[in-house]
UniProtKB/Swiss-Prot annotation:
Its main location: cytoplasm. GO terms for molecular function: metal ion binding; threonine-type endopeptidase activity. It is found in: Cytoplasm. InterPro entries: ATP-dep_Prtase_HsIV_su, Ntn_hydrolases_N, Proteasome_sua/b, Proteasome_suB-type. It holds the Pfam family Proteasome. Protease subunit of a proteasome-like degradation complex believed to be a general protein degrading machinery. This is ATP-dependent protease subunit HslV.
Length: 181
C-alpha cells in the first residue's frame, strides 16, 4: 500500500456454542506512520441484521466491497455463500476490482467466509478466522481460547482475541467493537 493510502487492520470472527461473534479494532492508519482515526467501525451488520461483515485493508476499497457484497446479499435473498461466491467471481473478472486492496470476513449463524483480495472464498476449518495486520495474533489467541477456555462465550472470545492482537500489533488498537448473532 502506498504511503497515502488509508488502511484498517484487524478483524476476528468465531462461531462457538451456537453463537457467532465478530470483532474489529478502531484504528485507521495513513501509510506506516500516522494514526488518522482511532474509532473507526469496521464491523457492520448487513441484511436485516442477519449477516456480519468486517474488513481489513484500504478503507475506500473496503467500502466498495461492502457495497458490492450487500448488493449480492439482497440479490440472493441473504444466502451468504452464494453472495460471497458471486462477489468473488465479479472481483476476479473485473480489472478495476482486482486492484482493490482489502479483504472481507462475512458470517451468519451457519458459516464464516473470507473473501480475499484475489477473489477467493475461504471457509475456515475450525469456525474461527482473522484478517489484517494483527490477524495472526488474534487467530492464535482465538484458537487457544477455543481449545482451553471453551466456557467463554463467542463474544468474549472475539473481544479477548482482539485485545491480544492490540497488545502486540502497532496497527491494531484496543477500541474494540464486537457484534454478535
Amino acid at each position: 500500500m502506498s504511503n497515502t493510502t488509508l488502511h484498517a487492520t484487524t478483524i476476528y470472527a468465531v462461531r462457538h456454542n451456537g453463537k457467532a461473534a465478530m470483532a474489529g479494532d478502531g484504528q485507521v492508519t495513513l501509510g506506516q506512520q500516522v494514526i488518522m482515526k482511532q474509532t473507526a467501525r469496521k464491523v457492520r451488520r448487513l441484511y436485516e441484521g442477519k449477516v456480519l461483515a468486517g474488513f481489513a485493508g484500504s478503507v475506500a476499497d473496503a467500502f466498495t466491497l461492502f457495497e458490492k457484497f450487500e448488493t449480492k446479499l439482497q440479490q440472493f435473498s441473504g444466502n451468504l455463500e452464494r453472495a460471497a461466491v458471486e462477489l468473488a467471481q465479479e472481483w476476479r473478472g473485473d480489472k478495476q476490482l482486482r486492484q482493490l486492496e482489502a479483504m472481507l470476513i462475512v458470517m451468519d449463524k451457519d458459516a464464516i467466509l473470507v473473501v480475499s483480495g484475489t477473489g477467493e472464498v475461504i471457509a475456515p476449518d475450525d469456525d474461527l478466522i482473522a484478517i489484517g495486520s494483527g490477524g495472526n495474533y488474534a487467530l492464535s489467541a482465538g484458537r487457544a481460547l477455543k481449545h482451553h477456555a471453551s466456557h467463554l462465550s463467542a463474544e468474549e472470545m472475539a473481544y479477548e482475541s482482539l485485545k491480544v492482537a492490540a497488545d502486540i500489533c502497532v496497527f491494531t488498537n484496543d477500541n474494540i467493537v464486537v457484534e454478535t448473532l
